[in-house]
């Protein structure tokens, strides 16, 4: 299997979908993991404006350093990429304070939902879509 060809086909599919639907911006959350690195790279390859966001919540800088380096690499490789760090710690703290006593599991899930809400809000404000890391 020629992985470069596969990557190009997937990137073309993303670009075609965006163009057919009038989408001008692709928004991807990056965590420093493989899934988000691949998804953000495929999105950047489309040539469509791609916003790549790192959204730490009470994380040590070393924990999200990989995503920061990946964002910088994308920006140097493709001129259509913008990226930034949005520290959601204070937003999460306010939610936790207002919500009262919550289980550890619900708190873990709330971090993912806060990041998801942020991605969709930014995509909606930029005539874009969120490009997820799932199938």
Language model regions located:
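ATP-dependent adenylation/nucleotidyltransferase module used to activate substrates
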Residues: 1-135
